[in-house]
Amino acid sequence: MSYTAPTDPVNKQEVVKLSQLCELCHGRKAVLRRPKNLQKICKECFYYVFETEIHNTIVSNNLFQRGEKVAIGASGGKDSTVLAHILKLLNDRHDYGVKLVLLSIDEGIVGYRDDSLATVKRNQKQYQLPLEIVSFRDLYDWTMDEIVAIAGIRNSCTYCGVFRRQALDRGAAKLDINHVVTGHNADDMAETVLMNILRGDVARLERSTAIITQSAGSPIRRSKPFKYCYQKEIVLYAHYKKLDYFSTECTYAPEAFRGTARELMKNLEAVRPSCIIDIIQSGENLVLKKKKRHPNSKVEFKDGNRCERCGYLSSNKICKACMLLQGLEKNRASMSIDNDTNVDGAARVMRTLEKLSF
C-alpha cells in the first residue's frame, strides 16, 4: 500500500510520551491524550474506543438497513478516507449487511482534485470497493476553475456546495443507491452551527445538526456517522493506522467564511475542549418551532416539486443549481461577484439565492 505522510499537524499535546500506563487497560503505556476528554491512553485502546463510539452512533441512530447499498462520499481527504476504512471494518466486524460503494465528485480544480482522486483510486484498490466518479464538467458543462475565473473566489464555496450536493444525489441515483454517508465530523457541524448563528440564520440549525437528512419527496437520505468524532481524533487515527489520504487544503478554501468560524472554534476549544459537542448540542436546543400555516394559505411550490429546467427536486420553480448556472451562462464574459460597485447578473443571482431556503 502506498502511504502518503500526512501534512496535517498532529498536536504534540495529543501525542504524549509518558511512563504512566493507559488509563483504560492499565497494561500498556499511554502514547496519546484524547482531545475529546483528555484521557491518556495507548494506541490499542484508542482504536477500540474510537471505532466503538462510531459503531454505537450507527446502531443508536439506526443508520443502516441490512441489504441496502450505501455510497461513501469519497474525496481522498482524511475524513472520507477514515470513514471508508472504518465502515468497511465495522461492516465486517458487526455484520451490518450493507454493500459499500465509493462515490467521488470531480469539481475540476487542477492541482487539487485531480491529485486527491488519485488517492481515492488507491483506496478503492486497497479496500476492494466499487468506485463511481461524477464530474462537474459532465453534469454542468463547467469546472470550478472556470466558475471561479468568472465569479470570483469569495463565493466559490456557494457554487461548489450547491453543485456538489446535487452531484452526490445524481451519482447515487445513477448507481440505484438511496443512502449516502459523508465524513462530516463534530468540528464541521459545530462550525456550521456557528456560521448560521453569526449570519442570523437560526432556521437552518435543525438541518445542520441532524445526523440524518432527507429532502421531502427525495428517495436519497444522507447520514453522518462521524457526527460526534473530533477532527483531531480522526487525524490521530489516520496517523497511527498509516492510512493513505490527501491532506492538501482546497485551493479556494482560505477565502471561505467557514475559515472564520473554524478559527473562532479553535480558540474556544483551547479553553474548553468540550466546546465542540457543546456547540452542536446548543444548535439542537436552539431549533425553532415550526410555525402553523393558516389553513387558507396557498403555497405554489413546496418540497417534492421538480425544477422546470433540469427536473431535479426543488422547492422553487428553478433549482438553486440552475439559477447559478443561468447566472454564469448570461455573464460568462463579465460576471464578478467580488466587484461590490458593479451589481451584475451574478450578484443579483446571489441576492435571490439568499432569499431562498437551502
From Swiss-Prot:
InterPro entries: CTU1-like_ATP-bd, CTU1_C, Ncs6/Tuc1/Ctu1, Rossmann-like_a/b/a_fold, TilS/TtcA_N, tRNA_thiolation_TtcA_Ctu1, UPF0021_CS
SUPFAM superfamilies: Adenine nucleotide alpha hydrolases-like
Keyword Transferase among UniProt keywords: yes
EC number: 2.7.7.-
Entry keyword annotation includes tRNA processing: yes
Pathway named in the protein's UniProt entry: tRNA modification; 5-methoxycarbonylmethyl-2-thiouridine-tRNA biosynthesis
Signal peptide: none
GO MF annotations, alphabetized: nucleotidyltransferase activity; tRNA binding; tRNA-uridine 2-sulfurtransferase activity
Residues forming coiled coils: none
Top EC class of this enzyme: transferase
Pfam families: ATP_bind_3, zn-ribbon_14
One BP term from GO: tRNA wobble uridine modification
Keywords: Cytoplasm, RNA-binding, Transferase, tRNA processing, tRNA-binding
Annotated localization: Cytoplasm
One of the record's GO cellular component terms: cytosol
Function, in words: Plays a central role in 2-thiolation of mcm(5)S(2)U at tRNA wobble positions of tRNA(Lys), tRNA(Glu) and tRNA(Gln). Directly binds tRNAs and probably acts by catalyzing adenylation of tRNAs, an intermediate required for 2-thiolation. It is unclear whether it acts as a sulfurtransferase that transfers sulfur from thiocarboxylated URM1 onto the uridine of tRNAs at wobble position. Prior mcm(5) tRNA modification by the elongator complex is required for 2-thiolation. May also be involved in protein urmylation.
Family per similarity comment: Belongs to the TtcA family. CTU1/NCS6/ATPBD3 subfamily.
PANTHER family in the cross-refs: ATPASES OF THE PP SUPERFAMILY-RELATED (PTHR11807), CYTOPLASMIC TRNA 2-THIOLATION PROTEIN 1 (PTHR11807:SF12)
Annotated protein name in UniProt: Cytoplasmic tRNA 2-thiolation protein 1
Organism (species): Candida glabrata (strain ATCC 2001 / BCRC 20586 / JCM 3761 / NBRC 0622 / NRRL Y-65 / CBS 138)
Gene expressing this chain: NCS6
